[in-house]
Amino acid sequence: MKYKPNPLIYAADKDFYSSFKLTITMRSPVNHTALARAVGAAMTRYPYFCVFPEKVGESIVLTFNQRSVPVFDDERCVVLGSEECNGHLLCFGCRENQIFLHASHYIADGMGIDPLLKTVLYLYAAEEYGTDGLQTERIHLPDEAIADEEYAYPFPDAPFEIDNALPLRKAPDNAYGLNPDAFDKDGLYAYHLHIPQRAMMSKANPSDGSPVSFLSVMMYRAFCSLDAKIELPVVAHVQHQYRQALRTPINRHSLVSYIPAFLPPSARNWHVEQQNTVLRGQIILGSEVAEDLQAVNRIIDALPCEENADLAQKKAAMRKYVAESIEGKTFGISYVGKMDWCGLDQHVRDIHAYIGEKRTENMLLMEVMTVGEDFTINMMQSGRGRKYVDAFMEQLALMEIPVTLIGEERYTLCDTVLPL
């Protein structure tokens, strides 16, 4: 079988890895043999993840790969799509009590990889610990039928017809930049934080079900506490999912896009609730509304999907789209929703997501997930240095929100080889 990839695949170059890493910390040491069995069984349920990239004419397609998905007994990074990875665009690993998943955004984005992760963890936990306390109703098991909606290409052939749409918001041409001396530029560093969900959301907008706007305000206030002369807007690129606008709620491609959200220098004197409300108005667009559909249309319009477009034209179009969507912001924040652990969190202590590349080397990146009763936050930057992390934690403390720094880590991400 062949599948259409995320169109950002055409933007791939040495500065745009478009891969991510998940680290799941279990409550006991990981059995590599049992994990390998769990991965092998789980992948039979997800043929659209068992793929290798292939050039067909002037397009890239994902072709079913019969070779096994690697499960390493360490934390190694490999080149996704390479022989070391059996040509696959994802791989697993484990070390001590941690499980690692490296995957390409070209096969999934948003929570598209979430069902696979839960299947693997369920099969592993069932063998190692038994099934007590686990709910299988929302876990795909290997013998379950595969719905067409899971792997169908979610992008329409033509833009939606929209009435009464507001103009798409454009990020300011100049955004507040981070202090280059805040990091030592010695590789990618992550700082792991835990925040109780109830404690934080009690301080946020009561109608805001997402932590994104509140965390963005806390980050904004941290910048202001460090720099009394901010004259440019602080701009976040915020991950937003248009699943409902596309009517593909279970699709592996949830159509993750980035919308600019910003606060002007004058906002530094606003009350936190006012800041949160203003930012929330920019971030939470709602579902199936004209503005959401218009944002979808922007992506469709950017796609070089004309039949006569050659590979070079597709690459140029997508690189332009990536540059306009990602570069030039102050920080990025991503939250794909509350994790439905189905009882698996009795065996999971922590989970963190990692991203980062040269196109974002002057930005802070925040990945927000949930486990148990906590938000788990990964703050990532291009080098070691706690200037912004400490300032962020201080702002939470001023709001009487408990926050725990779990640790810091120098990390690496997988590169990807493509037949371009």
Where are these regions (language model features)?
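Histidine-centered acyl-transfer/condensation active-site motif
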Residues: 84-130, 135-146, 369-388
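Non-catalytic, low-complexity flexible loops and terminal extensions
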Residues: 2-5, 107, 111-115, 119-202, ...
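Conserved catalytic core of two-metal-ion nucleotidyltransferases
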Residues: 61-63, 140-141
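Tryptophan-centered motif/residue detector
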Residues: 61-62, 90, 124, 220
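Acyl activation and transfer enzymes in specialized metabolism, enriched
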Residues: 27-46, 102-118, 189-231, 377-379, ...
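A short, mixed-charge helix-start or loop-turn motif at secondary-structure junctions
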Residues: 21, 102, 181-183, 204
